[in-house]
Amino acid sequence: FFETIKSYSISSKELKKRVIFSDIDELNHKLEKKEKVLVLTSHQCNWEWLLLASQLNLNQPLNVIYKSISNRNIDKSLIKSRSRFGSKLIESKKALLHIRRNIKKIGIIALVADQSPIKKNKKSWRILLNQDTAFFKSVEYLPRLLNSHVYFASMERLSRGKYSVKFDLISTPNQNLNKDILSEYVRKLEHQIKQKPDEWLWTHKRWKFTREDI
């Protein structure tokens, strides 16, 4: 909770000390070559710091797809906090249209992909932790739309208030059509949760509905 509040005021200098990247240069190299990158992450450790610190280490604006919340004042406050180092926030309901309109300008997109999609929206199903689980369809169609490299961003707590981040390649542009990117994401997500179950946000209502509820 303290770190969440700290997200609103932490300086770029302090954040760089607290979140260490081992291979973000690989992403910058792709962007320098005008190649697109999609980063899939999760509610592991401090995802707010992960996104903020990523922007500080990237040479292009990070486009973050997010789900808005009903309280407009809190939503505006979160947008202000998340974008203060240059990231661009894209509301999930408008994401597809925004990306299609701006596809030539967009270099890198991030999505916290373990969130539960809205019940009425289209979704894909995979088994996560022995539970039939709904995921955003965008995890499947965005790599093909963008013709992007796809990375899984994993975060690990080193000590109190200090983390390391690693980017694992899931797919490349020439693999996207034939690869089950969502299944690979779920596999990496489950492995991460099992390795450090105490660092995943179990309270974010991941299994709010089943296939039978749809």
Predicted regions and their residues:
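A short linear-motif detector with a strong N-terminal bias
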Residues: 17-18, 43-44, 67-70, 88-90, ...
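Non-catalytic C-terminal accessory region of glycerolipid acyltransferases
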Residues: 29-32, 36, 56-57, 93-214
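Short hydrophobic/aromatic-rich motifs at helix boundaries and adjacent loops
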Residues: 22-24, 48-52, 70-71, 110-113, ...
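Catalytic core of membrane glycerolipid acyltransferases/transacylases, capturing the structured
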Residues: 35-93, 118-127, 131-133
